[in-house]
Swiss-Prot record:
It comes from Monkeypox virus. Keywords: Early protein, Host endosome, Host-virus interaction, Membrane, Microtubular outwards viral transport, Viral release from host cell, Virion, Virulence. This is Protein OPG056. Pfam families: Pox_F12L. GO terms for biological process: microtubule-dependent intracellular transport of viral material towards cell periphery. Disulfide bonds: none annotated. It is found in: Virion membrane; Host endosome. Belongs to the orthopoxvirus OPG056 family.
Length: 635
């Protein structure tokens, strides 16, 4: 099996091979090393991230493991499903609520003044109990409005004498719970079909769930420490045996991983006496150090590890930065060289435990020299970038693209007096993330040539992006930027699918789309019904001039970094769901997808194989490559 995986890794430069590799990663975790001996753990949940950071075909595959704990953190829980209010002449269905009965009685008070007076005078406590509602009504002399379930009303003739009773149709709806509909007209009522939606858009638009980007950039920290975790191979999979820090100590333990981690945490706690936040600086730590430690993280140790953050029970916080994501693809030694420190080699990861034991002294010495070099390079780079990209600070970001683009957006915002906002809560963040589609849309499986947008940067830098807080609207306004919850119906005739959906047998589905994607879908023949939207009244003007100025400034400081960064931005606009400019990424990807579709419109559909927001596969038999394809590059 190892030989099979090694062969797949060496040839993982096309869609088919990568998909085969994914199938194996459902069962195995690949233990690999780069050319500097840096350990890399590749598993089902992180392979896309690894491929976006490096060429996996040149990695050395050391082994496989079944260790199922090596997985990403659980996804954000699904938001509570939502049903909007429906006020029909025959019935009233309140919007999703923990207390739908209270909503119904308040609705009745709009028509019955005596109920309104009692509510104003006495109030009513929240409850989902019909008997408690009826007890309150009786105590206020309003028993004539008592609540009766529809089923009971139909079974018992006695209720029919009391025409003012509040008849409610009760039901239980998955992911929502108990729901009640007030039946206004018994003769015409039939239980309605109600759209159960994944988001409450009006709730998501609340001001307190959005903050201006500039307000999140004014942060300070006291201490920075370079750190590296080293792993050895055992019969039971990889284990951490050494944690090195600079400036600081090196912790080694071959007998107990738990004690190794606890010693490290005790040391961290001791140095945090004068600050509540410190920064740990690693290199490729997201691909090895953090996932490996997460597997062996002790229970009840007073610290929780989540993604790249350690949080103590008393509120102290440790941010673990992966500086590789600020290196623009440089090796560790090249990164250190280009930022002015002496390059030092580091110990190889994933060596045998017996070899690590035998060479502990030299490994510790080598590790400390490497970390000193990393620390000095990071201090130089962070100081330089924080001046050039003020007020952005490196530790506020997870990668250099986010920092660079945020600084550009912030500069344009300051020049125009309009700021970009970001969601401060998981649910609006999830709503924005849901509008992003990075998946390939498969049309057919014919042999094809792959084309990529020549410059993503050129496309996205000349467009407009949302400014200010969003407003809730039932339907978006043409010409304004918005993100809408949509009911999508695919065309009945032969068509190229432009809206991604994972169920080919469904012709109508609900999804989240940007206003840009909605325009593209309608052009492609889709029917779109908007079910609520976040809309922005103002736009940040195009970023092109400010972006070019920023590139020139950084180029004067470090040409290698700038050239590599520019290459990344030209080829990619990889979405980062933890970024404070997630709104920018959302619309940038939509603009790219609209561009790809404009190219597809010029090609006979029979030749289109598959596509994403930045790539297009065209049949090898297609000879008529038109002028519009000049904006694409053949790979």
């Amino acid at each position: 099996m190892l030989n099979r995986i090694q062969t797949l890794m060496k040839t993982a430069n096309n869609y088919e091979t990568i998909e085969i590799l994914r199938n194996y990663l459902r069962l195995y975790i690949i233990l690999a090393r780069n050319e500097e001996g840096r350990g890399i753990l590749i598993y089902d949940d992180n392979i896309d991230s690894v491929m976006s950071m490096m060429n996996i075909t040149i990695l050395e595959v050391i082994g496989l493991t079944h260790c199922t704990k090596l997985r990403s953190s659980p996804p954000i829980p699904m938001s509570r499903l939502f049903m909007d209010e429906i006020d029909h002449e025959s019935y009233y269905s309140p919007k999703t609520s923990y207390y739908p009965l209270i909503d119904i009685i308040r609705k009745r008070s709009h028509e019955q003044g005596d109920i309104a007076l009692a509510l104003e005078r006495y109030g009513i406590e929240n409850t989902d109990s019909i008997s408690e509602i009826n007890e309150w009504l009786s105590s206020k002399g309003l028993a004539c409005y008592r609540f009766v379930k529809f089923n009971d009303y139909r079974k018992q003739q006695m209720y029919r004498k009391f025409s003012r009773y509040t008849i409610v149709d009760s039901m239980i709806i998955g992911h929502i719970g108990h729901h009640y509909i007030w039946i206004k007209n018994l003769e015409t009522y039939t239980r309605p079909e109600i759209d159960v939606l994944p988001f409450d858009i009006k709730c998501i638009s609340r001001d307190e769930l959005w903050a201006r980007i500039s307000s999140s950039l004014d942060q300070t920290h006291i201490k920075t420490i370079a750190v590296s975790v080293y792993g050895a191979i055992t019969d039971n999979g990889p284990i951490p045996y050494m944690i090195s820090t600079y400036p600081g100590n090196t912790f080694v333990n071959f007998n107990s991983v738990k004690d190794l981690i606890l010693d490290f945490l005790d040391w961290i706690k001791d140095i945090m006496t004068s600050t509540r936040t410190i920064i740990l600086v690693g290199y490729m730590s997201n691909l090895f150090d953090i996932p490996l430690l997460t597997v062996y993280w002790p229970n009840n140790c007073g610290w929780k590890i989540y993604n790249n953050t350690l949080i103590s029970s008393d509120g102290a916080r440790v941010i673990w930065m992966d500086v590789y994501k600020f290196s623009c693809g440089l090796s560790l030694q090249d990164y250190c060289y280009h930022w002015g420190s002496k390059p030092e080699s580091r110990p190889f990861d994933l060596i045998k435990k017996s070899d690590a034991k035998r060479n502990t002294k030299s490994l510790v010495k080598e590790s400390m020299a490497s970390l000193k070099s990393l620390y000095e390079a990071f201090e130089t780079q962070s100081g330089a970038l924080e001046v050039l990209m003020s007020p952005c600070r490196m530790f506020s970001f997870s990668r250099i693209e986010d920092m660079f683009l945020t600084s550009v957006i912030n500069r344009v915002s300051e020049n125009t007096g309009m700021g970009m906002y970001y969601p401060t809560n998981d649910i609006p963040s999830l709503f924005i993330e849901s509008s992003i589609c990075l998946d390939y849309i498969i049309v057919n499986n014919q042999e094809s040539n792959k084309y990529r947008i020549k410059s993503v940067l050129d496309i996205i830098s000349s467009k407009q992006y949302p400014a200010g807080r969003p407003n809730y609207v039932k339907n978006g306004t043409k010409g304004k930027l918005y993100i809408a919850l949509c009911k999508v119906t695919v065309p009945t005739n032969d068509h190229i699918p432009v809206v991604y959906h994972d169920d080919d047998n469904t012709t109508t589905f609900i999804t989240v789309l940007t206003s840009v994607d909605i325009e593209t879908a309608i052009r492609a023949g889709y029917s779109i019904v908007e079910l609520g939207a976040l809309q922005w009244d103002d736009n940040i003007p195009e970023l092109k001039d400010c972006l070019l100025d920023s590139i020139k400034i950084i180029y004067d400081l470090n040409a290698v970094t700038t050239n590599n960064l520019l290459e990344q931005l030209i080829e990619n606009i990889n979405f980062n769901n933890s970024s404070i400019i997630s709104l920018f990424y959302t619309f940038a990807i939509s603009y790219c997808r609209a561009f790809i579709y404009s190219i597809m419109e010029t090609i006979d559909p029979v030749y289109i194989s598959q596509f994403s927001y930045k790539e297009l596969y065209v049949s090898s038999s297609c000879k008529d490559i038109n002028e519009s394809m000049s904006q694409m590059v053949k790979l």
